[in-house]
């Protein structure tokens, strides 16, 4: 038998010689590759390997060999930005080979394994039995605890039920007593009213009898006096011929009647009122005339009501005081009096807001109907037929960047590369938007130099832009206008694609651009961000197609859709006044289809589309979503960013445009409102020192210096008095002009304004005040400055409740059963939850109940249920603290 060497053994078992020698060395056998290996040495090596690979005994057992392998490869994966990424993949494999040498050993191993499994099974069963016993013990303890809680709860409910029964009984008794007292009071009142009525009727009858007796007593004397009159005076007027005694008697009767109560049950009969006193026509005529022209108080049938009839007053967003008075059928002075009582000063021609007018009208007892002035506008804009389904549309892209970073070059190259030569050759782009066709779809570009249009659209809320492409030069980096573009894009909430331009120039460093943009939260996708970076060269045309693909990929993520059929709506990109064609507006259609002849409402302008052209100057008949067009036929030049909407009726469009013009004029006038002492705080911008500009004029120089020194001493860190002009003498037009230019108030001390100055003050709506006492002037300015100070707020604890128990509610979660220990718990106030005198939660109450009834507050010494909003970790022993925020009015020290 030939001897087996180490080298031959390594070839036989497929193991490198070095590894086999190492294994021999680990087993305590020193060998070289040429040495022979005996059976004993092989057995020793096998035992060592078995120990190393987990064998438990040294006897002959299956040989176990474990192989571990590593495989590395590179996998190309497509990224979200359209670029592929290389990912390193490492595969690890582990295999174990076992060789059976003896059947007995295998059986023995199986027997040992079965015994081990049986032992493990017995141990698991014993553990399960122990766990069941522990679980049963815990359940018994919990059951006992629940029974105790249920018993305590039943006891509390019984006590509460008894208390409620007693309270209900007392309430019923009190109600019965109140009803009995009310019944007795009603009976007494009815008896008193009946007695008063009888008494009034008796007095009225007595007065009638006295008047009749007086007339009978004086009738003979009247006849004698009348016979003494001349015949020429027979036809004289009643007021001339009636004797003074008769007039005195009638006046006395009238005065006596007026002193008595006016209430009576009888009226004079019509026949008695028309019949003459005697048989003669002369005296009968006089008597009849006297009765008609001078009726007594006994003949009056009704008194004119002093109350004003209630009116339904329709009030718009603003209304003039005189118009409000006319709608309420009262004089304007009455309205001004009511406003003065309410603390508001107004003139007859002053415009007041809707809220003030509503308070005045309701104070005077009228019903108010609030009207929106833009009802017609809303009706016109809602009368549209856009019931079609939305379809995919092309993205609208705005390219921004710093000056000389290649923005215009990028636009020009895209236009030359993707527009046919017949259309693009020699034609200069003459509108601010155009669209290009690519293999994957259409893209619309907006050219907004200086970001003017983009800012205007963002300010008006018109999301005309879907994607912003930021062009940054690789050799120049981030510049101020680049930062401005980033801010515009983030404010508008649109995604940002960065085009790193000029990569073909020497000194280009795209990585530096990434690092600088990362400081402004523009992170590349390679770094785990959301912004796509594309390296391009606008001059050479390098990777321009990649930029377009990135734009289309981003638009697919946005899933842009629009209604293609129906009445169109869009936004005005730019507008101008052409010499030969009139107002021209570039409109980007956002939804629907714009057709030639449609009636368009653009902001404050309107008109019928007389002509429509694309970006190449060609006449077209219609345009769909994401298509920019030039339209002619508007009444004026609209503003950039105005919404363009197709409407049905030209007359209504004109009315809406006129309303918008008037509203814009009112807003403009309101913005020109000069600073006044009453609204100075509204004119103060947050974070800045408020300034009160003053133009001061006095009668003597000493007064000017004293007042100026006192006013300047009033200045603080938050409010500053700035005297822009001062002098001696009357207030002139120059002073009024200075105050208008500097938004100042005019203070006159013992001086007055001349006619031209008063006219300027009225035209510019300035605040002019006269004073004769210096302390009144200083006190009013000081009060105005105090109103400009920001208010302070202080928290005051108004109640404290102790948590006695916690209940679970399916609707409100954890409900804390509490006892109010201090103050009052109010539902509307904020709260804090304290545990061990440490605040663990601050919020508000969601529920406050007492005896299952929602209450507004619970006072000291009463129990209540409290549910804390958005907080369920209330425990027994916690404290719930209720506080209120009190505003402290600040004044100048």
Swiss-Prot record:
Binding site for GTP: 401-408, 447-451, 501-504
Region Disordered, residue ranges: 51-203, 216-300
Region entry G5, spans: 537-539
Region named G1: 401-408
Domain of life: Bacteria
Predominant location category: cytoplasm
Keywords: Cytoplasm, GTP-binding, Initiation factor, Nucleotide-binding, Protein biosynthesis
GO MF annotation list: GTP binding; GTPase activity; guanosine tetraphosphate binding; translation initiation factor activity
Gene3D superfamilies: P-loop containing nucleotide triphosphate hydrolases (3.40.50.300), Putative DNA-binding domain, N-terminal subdomain of bacterial translation initiation factor IF2 (3.30.56.50), Translation factors (2.40.30.10), Translation initiation factor IF- 2, domain 3 (3.40.50.10050)
Biased composition range(s): Basic and acidic residues: 102-203, 216-238, 245-261
One Pfam short name: EF-G_D2
Chain segments carrying region G3: 447-450
InterPro entries: DNA-bd_dom_put_sf (IPR009061), EF-G-like_DII (IPR053905), EFTu-like_2 (IPR004161), IF2_assoc_dom_bac (IPR013575), IF2_II (IPR044145), IF2_N (IPR006847), P-loop_NTPase (IPR027417), Small_GTP-bd (IPR005225)
Domain tr-type G: 392-561
Location(s) in or outside the cell: Cytoplasm
Start and end residues of each stretch annotated as G2: 426-430
G4: region residues: 501-504
Family the entry assigns: Belongs to the TRAFAC class translation factor GTPase superfamily. Classic translation factor GTPase family. IF-2 subfamily.
PANTHER family: TR-TYPE G DOMAIN-CONTAINING PROTEIN (PTHR43381:SF5), TRANSLATION INITIATION FACTOR IF-2-RELATED (PTHR43381)
Task of the protein: One of the essential components for the initiation of protein synthesis. Protects formylmethionyl-tRNA from spontaneous hydrolysis and promotes its binding to the 30S ribosomal subunits. Also involved in the hydrolysis of GTP during the formation of the 70S ribosomal complex.
The protein, known as: Translation initiation factor IF-2
Gene: infB
